[in-house]
Amino acid sequence: MIYIAATSRLAAHVNMLIAQGWLLFFVCLTGFAKEPWFNWTMISNSDAIMANMPHIIGFLFVIVETLIVKAFVIPLFLKKVVKKTHAHRDTDANIPHFYCLFISSIILFAGFLVANIDIPELKLIDPMYFGVSSAIIITSLWLITIKHKVLSNVIGFITMENGIFLFSLSVAKEMPIIVNLGVLLD
């Protein structure tokens, strides 16, 4: 996210969307392995597979959708749009890129500070996911407001959706499939 704030090249923004898609894929893959219903020994037990079938279907949907849509389909479509429009840079930002980098770093730091506040009611929330996702959402909203090109705004919106998806993984463990369906509708 900090790199997206620091550069004006749209191809680099699209490449960062690909990296975000792969990172979200690995977060989903490792995050679901910590779920109480998931156990490596259930692979050989057909009764355990049938008992956890709704969880397995949701897990497979989230994994496949994250990898295919977020890491391949949307970035490849945006690369094609960047090539056809010959819009290679967004140099019309309201704020110079150094200040964008500085403000994005402050937002990321503030996200980690907020995530590590010791409130007993928030113990169910994963602080790493919460801190990163809140920083991604706020930075994306901020970048959408200061950029002028439509492609930069679309990339900011998709990055914000990635942050919302990560936020749903940290807060609502049972509902990432609903969040993914909402993102697919966008």
What are the functions of these language-model segments?
Residues 1-186:
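Alpha-helical transmembrane segments of multi-pass membrane proteins predominantly involved
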